[in-house]
């Protein structure tokens, strides 16, 4: 049996830099998307870069979702694979 794999990456622009540098809010966002998609979170990891920027990810039983931010540019990329 072969599983169908789906992957999507979304670029989000003109985002408030404070949000893009808030690890708790970004993890909450990932969890909300996971729940809305009826997926199942297993583990989370977050890395805060200096002086700014965050990479955060949730390992899902179906695969993963991640966000990478550049607050200085107001940009984030959200990637999900299931």
Residue ranges of model-derived segments:
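Polybasic/polar functional segments that serve as interface/processing modules
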Residues: 1-82
């Amino acid at each position: 049996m072969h599983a169908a794999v789906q992957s999507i990456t979304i670029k989000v622009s003109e985002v408030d830099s404070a949000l893009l540098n808030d690890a708790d809010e970004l993890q909450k966002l990932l969890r909300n998307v996971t729940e809305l998609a009826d997926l199942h979170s297993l583990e989370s990891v977050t890395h805060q870069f200096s002086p700014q920027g965050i990479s955060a990810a949730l390992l899902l039983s179906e695969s993963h979702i991640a966000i990478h931010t550049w607050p200085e540019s107001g940009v984030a990329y959200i990637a999900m694979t299931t």
